[in-house]
Swiss-Prot record:
The gene is tspan31. The keyword Transmembrane applies. This is Tetraspanin-31. It is found in: Membrane. One of its GO terms (cellular component) is membrane. The chain crosses the membrane at residues 13-33, 45-65, 73-93, 176-196. Pfam families: Tetraspanin.
Length: 212
């Protein structure tokens, strides 16, 4: 049986918006997990993912209210905003999936350079490592970091660089963020189509002579 009736479209749209709320919560949790374990060091990336999660939840609330009350104006703005969110989320997700190791290293280097010494020391203790990368263009930084490093590994004199440890987890985090974002960006197109279809349907409980 094809879901084409008013009630079926309404229930489908409500269910989809509940899924959006869960996805928004998932994005916030994954971003917080990445920050807590030092996987993603840039506060701009963390803030961006959390902002997308909160924004997606707000859009889902608007969609739920519009679906429950068959509110024409709210459904229209819901469609427009959801399509814009789709474009943004699709672009970000593709960027996460397409980021290679060299780009990840550059991102970590730029984030490391703007960190204060206290932030670096705190991260080194949490990951039990010293310095970022032992490369020729970062020799000055690595020597300074090794001098200031107070991680437990310094007592064993077997410290690895923090960059290597973060790269091990950053690929995993980027794949999770990119995969989840890409999958649900396509469900947002489904949401736009459902909202458009539902908006143009007549409410059977309304006055039969009333215009949509």
């Amino acid at each position: 049986m094809v879901c084409g009736g008013f009630t079926c479209s309404k229930n489908a749209l409500c269910s989809l918006n509940v899924v959006y709320m869960l996805v928004g919560l998932l994005l916030i949790v994954v971003a917080a997990w990445g920050k807590g374990f030092g996987i993603v060091s840039s506060i701009h990336i963390i803030g961006g993912v959390i902002a997308v999660g909160f924004f997606l939840q707000l859009i889902a609330i608007v969609g739920l209210i519009g679906a429950v009350h068959h509110h024409q104006v709210m459904l229209f703005f819901y469609m427009v905003i959801l399509f814009v969110v789709f474009l943004f989320q699709f672009g970000v997700s593709c960027s996460c999936l397409a980021m290679n190791q060299g780009q990840q290293e550059k991102l970590l280097e730029s984030s490391w350079k703007i960190m204060s010494n206290d932030t670096r020391i705190s991260l080194e203790k949490k990951l039990d490592c010293c310095g970022l990368f032992n490369s020729t263009n970062l020799q000055a930084d690595i020597m300074s970091d090794l001098h200031l490093c107070t991680s437990p590994c310094t007592q064993k004199k077997e410290c690895v660089t923090c960059g290597l440890k973060m790269l091990q987890h950053s690929s995993e985090a980027l794949k999770i963020l990119g995969g989840v974002g890409l999958f649900f960006s396509f469900t947002e197109i489904l949401g736009v189509w459902l909202a458009m279809r539902y908006r143009n349907q007549k409410d059977p409980r309304a006055n039969p002579s009333a215009f949509l």
